[in-house]
Amino acid sequence: MLHQKLNPTSSEDLTIDVDLLYETDPCELKLDEMIEAEPEPEMIEGLPASDALTPADRYLELFEHVQSTKLFPDSKTFPDCAPKMDPLDILIRYRKVRRHRDFDLRRFVENHFWLPETLSSEYVSNPENSLKEHIDQLWPILTREPQDHIPWSSLLALPQSYIVPGGRFSETYYWDSYFTMLGLAESGREDLLKCMADNFAWMIENYGHIPNGNRTYYLSRSQPPVFALMVELFEEDGVRGARRYLDHLKMEYAFWMDGAESLALNQAYRHVVRMPDGSLLNRYWDDRDTPRDESWLEDVETAKHSGRPPNEVYRDLRAGAASGWDYSSRWLRDAGRLASIRTTQFIPIDLNAFLYKLESAIANISALKGERDTEALFRQKASDRRAAVNHYLWDDENGCYRDYDWRREEMALFSAASIVPLYVGMANHEQADRLANVVRSRLLTPGGIMATEYETGEQWDKPNGWAPLQWMAIQGFKLYGDDMLGDEIAHNWLKTVNHFYQEHHKLIEKYHISGGTPREGGGGEYPLQDGFGWTNGVVRRLIGLYGEP
């Protein structure tokens, strides 16, 4: 595999002058206002109330004290702690005692907060179990119940049971859940599928979108919009009829397209960019421009090394988290430096393919319900998006989709995200055939397909392979008649996961698949996680299609 390096660029190229939200952000949450008037909680009968305050907003200088001193090795630990009493009383106590000579921050936190539990860590796998048996027995371990919610915690209560990925992740995640659902369906767990369907619909109804995850600190962003794919899965498996979700799909679409009507050429607002020819495409975005609660110290340190206004860096870090690819060379100006992140300046191929699927789903379900005007409107929207993607994101010279840098008006890097248009049926057969050749030569390994061909130390780059990318590549190529490539990726991935399982008796978040024996994937802001929701889901589905490896 060719080893590629990316060259840094001068800071003169990186100015932002047309993004409506960089100078003034009407959606920015004001901390002083939030302290004076907390949002009304969303009530679920029989459960403690949730509210929208993040731990950073709620605990203010106490939060910064804990995070800046690295009291816990993982920055996510304190945001996930639950208070033992009214948070305002905790903050008042902290302000009274913090300057005392004998003040002990660790003891104070331990006396006033419940530390998060990692229930799945107590599970011991049976080495005699097959891979299929292991996954089926993990579903109850990864299931959380509504009554698990603790008052004033950052966890957002949900009305039904849900699946968490495992490891440090004790909440459900939006796009992870779709790939987890594939395995639940294969395992015959329609009960959990129904619960998760109800939960995601409930979040759209109450928050206007599906958050990154069910934590207050995730409310300001979403993740790749895969609810339309979930609805399709519910329909196919007889769990829930697609018609009941039409309004939810429209609400999600409104979230992603907010502000589109008022944009002039070459302007952006939140998730939407008006291209030079007047077409509309989308980018990842977060309504906040502060350090992430769950990675506070890491974000502060990254911003220090950027040479840019910290709020711009924080926004791009948050938008990178919204992409699900946190982090990757896809979002970096200089592939060796996370501080060069520019997520909001890229038009991602995967996001726009998922939105094409959303537009198509709204059109199709509207047709089923006899809503002809809505059907025609959204068929046109889908057609317009496909045309814009082909114009800006299809690299005809090299035969692949690429992200587009709308600031510089040039194509960005090639990655495994390019297979999403095939998965949602947006490509034509010539594009699919040409893309297959590129994937074979640049991403395919004996262990599966890599996220990218660039070695940066980030987790969504070479040498790592991820379950959702394998699934979309397998099904995408098979949809266009390339069964040989789809089957090869499937067998390679099953071999990778099974080899690791036979040695360690667990499934993990990502795998090192570039050369040699498959092993744990590296990179990222946190240690490798096991469990693992979407790996379990994809592998379980593949076992149903191909049998045990």
From Swiss-Prot:
Q: What is the lineage of its organism?
A: Bacteria, Pseudomonadati, Pseudomonadota, Gammaproteobacteria, Enterobacterales
Can you tell me which residues form the catalytic site? 326 (proton donor/acceptor), 509 (proton donor/acceptor)
Q: Which gene encodes it?
A: treF
Which transformation does this protein catalyse, written as a reaction?
alpha,alpha-trehalose + H2O = alpha-D-glucose + beta-D-glucose
Q: Where in the cell is it found?
A: Cytoplasm
The record lists the organism as Salmonella arizonae (strain ATCC BAA-731 / CDC346-86 / RSK2980)
Q: In which pathway does it act?
A: Glycan degradation; trehalose degradation; D-glucose from alpha,alpha-trehalose: step 1/1
One GO biological-process annotation of the entry reads:
cellular hyperosmotic response
Which EC number(s) does the record attach to this protein?
A: 3.2.1.28
Name of this protein: Cytoplasmic trehalase
Its predominant location is: cytoplasm
Give the similarity note. Belongs to the glycosyl hydrolase 37 family.
Q: Name one GO molecular function term.
A: alpha,alpha-trehalase activity
What's in the GO CC field?
Answer: cytoplasm
